[in-house]
Amino acid sequence: MTFLYKFNKNGTTAEGYVQASDEAAAQAKVDAKFPAGSKTKVLGLEQVYVATTRNARMSAFKGRPLARACQGLKASEALKVVEFSPKKAADIIKKTILSAIANAENNHGAKGAADLTVKLCVLEESVRMRRYWPTARGSAHPIARRLCHCRVVLAESKKSKKGAK
């Protein structure tokens, strides 16, 4: 299982991932990473479901606005957002969200997309395919065909208290 931990180091909050069989083992790994004398304070630990699409033939720059729009939404709502988007990134993000839902159901026994939230949806730059375009007088200009990685992290939705003020 994958667990997400939040930690505070020198006044800034950051996140990291740890692989473990259960929450106690994950907590032990996090405690080993940050010993008691360090200035880092672990804020929380929760189980997440991760899916990654690697080396997608698209520029990460063009798909990042759509990825940001999906963050914080329920998985079913995020699928609706990307389904009606005309961008090329929509197909890649949709497949990755569906893969993360399938990972949650098949590998970890989650109940489905109804109670999962998109915690993180990022498009990161990958390698570039180098090509050359022939130009005048026998010279050539380099062309970089960009690729990207899409990573989606789903977490269990927090149950909100109805009627709370």
Language model features: what each stretch is:
Residues 1-14:
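Short aromatic-glycine-(Arg/Gly/Cys) micro-motifs in beta-strand/loop hairpins
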Residues 2, 147-149:
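Active-site lining segments that contact anionic ligands and/or coordinate catalytic metals
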Residues 19-21, 25-28, 33-35, 43-123, ...:
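Ribosome large-subunit tunnel/peptidyl-transferase-proximal elements
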Residues 124-128:
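Short, charged/polar surface micro-motifs in flexible loops or helix N-caps
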Residues 129-140:
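Short, low-complexity, polybasic intrinsically disordered segments
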Residues 142-144:
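C-terminal structural segments of small proteins and small subunits
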